[in-house]
Swiss-Prot record:
Function: Component of the acetyl coenzyme A carboxylase (ACC) complex. First, biotin carboxylase catalyzes the carboxylation of biotin on its carrier protein (BCCP) and then the CO(2) group is transferred by the carboxyltransferase to acetyl-CoA to form malonyl-CoA.
Gene3D superfamilies according to UniProt: 2-enoyl-CoA Hydratase, Chain A, domain 1
A GO cellular component entry from the record: acetyl-CoA carboxylase complex
Short name of any one Pfam family annotated for the protein: ACCA
Name of the gene: accA
Name of the featured protein: Acetyl-coenzyme A carboxylase carboxyl transferase subunit alpha
Catalytic activity from the UniProt record: N(6)-carboxybiotinyl-L-lysyl-[protein] + acetyl-CoA = N(6)-biotinyl-L-lysyl-[protein] + malonyl-CoA
Metabolic or biological pathway: Lipid metabolism; malonyl-CoA biosynthesis; malonyl-CoA from acetyl-CoA: step 1/1
Record-annotated CoA carboxyltransferase C-terminal domain positions: 37-292
């Protein structure tokens, strides 16, 4: 297990507890009371830390290296029913964007999402979860296929942003994202979107239009990352914590502003602390969202989606 800077008190107590247990096994000394006391202190420390997280700390948790990624959710929720589909039929197969058909609680879905890597080699292979235009065009191809066969769409968002390289711009990055938004608003099947990690800017919006939009508790959704915001406003990344607070990017902020429909609770410590519980909770929210949409006529589905996005935001003097 890797620890973030604010989790170091937890790490110290867990190490103390581990040593206490080892001493108990290797000697005749009764360390049960000591172990219980350390464990009690550990549980209280976890509550004190995780119940009072700052916006920046939630950003850090969303990027935790042990956090489950899109394919982890797909494997856990769909099992062996998932069939991955590849390519945009125009340029190439973008490894930062994955998608395919799978069943969740017996219902077929077309699933699309950004995928990050687990180590240096796979992070480069997945381009750090930053999709190129062909990734967004692949996503749109799969969503249009789902529309053709009447299959609902599930999108899993986890990206630090769309790839900003020159070659991506030359191949039409902005157009690809804009086209996806345009088409998703009009897609004739239910769309459920879940932000499972980072939800940065147009990179997230390119697969982020949904009839139901959920955020996991320790994720963020914003037009810009705190570091980039800090570098623009204060010419330094040192103010990233201040930027995170100002951006109102946490799941609770997004729900208060009615930019997402609900927040999916995570186990204490984050999704990676209890993956099985996280996967089950996410699957339940997917089924719940789909059940709320499945009986709507196509006209009502699209009208409600249009209204949802037309009514977002408010103007204040």
């Amino acid at each position: 297990m890797e620890y973030l800077d604010f989790e170091l008190p937890i790490k110290e107590l867990e190490e103390q507890l581990e040593k206490c247990v080892i001493i108990g096994k290797e000697s005749d000394v009764d360390v049960t009371p000591t172990c219980k006391e350390i464990n009690k202190k550990l549980e209280q420390t976890k509550k004190d830390i995780y119940k009072n997280l700052t916006a920046w700390q939630r950003v850090q948790l969303s990027r935790h290296p042990n956090r489950p990624y899109t394919l982890d959710y797909i494997k856990a929720i769909c099992g062996d029913t998932f069939l991955e589909l590849h390519g945009d039929r125009g340029f190439k197969d973008d490894k930062a964007m994955v998608g395919g058909l799978g069943k969740i609680n017996g219902q077929s879905f077309m699933i699309v999402g950004q995928q990050k890597g687990y180590n240096t080699k796979t992070r480069q292979y997945r381009n750090f979860g930053m999709a190129n235009p062909e990734g967004y065009r692949k996503a749109l191809r799969l969503m249009k296929m789902a529309e053709k066969f009447g299959i609902p769409v599930l999108t899993l968002v986890d990206t630090p942003g769309a790839y900003p390289g020159l070659e991506a711009e030359e191949r039409g990055q902005g157009e690809a994202i804009a086209r996806n938004i345009f088409e998703m608003v009009r897609l004739q099947v239910p769309i459920i979107t879940i932000i499972v990690g980072e939800g940065a800017s147009g990179g997230a919006l390119g697969i982020g239009v949904g009839d139901r939009v959920y955020m996991l508790e320790n994720t963020w959704y914003s037009v810009i990352s705190p570091e980039s915001c800090s570098s623009i406003l204060w010419k330094s990344w040192e103010y990233k914590e201040r930027a995170a607070e100002a951006l109102k990017l946490t799941s609770s902020d997004m729900k208060k502003q009615k930019l997402v429909d609900d927040v999916i609770p995570e186990p204490l410590g984050g999704a990676h602390y209890d993956r099985e519980t996280t996967f089950k909770t996410v699957a339940d929210y997917i089924t719940k969202g789909y059940n709320e949409l499945k009986d709507l006529s196509t006209a009502d589905l699209i009208a409600q989606r249009m209204d949802k996005y037309s009514n977002m935001g408010e103007y204040k003097e």
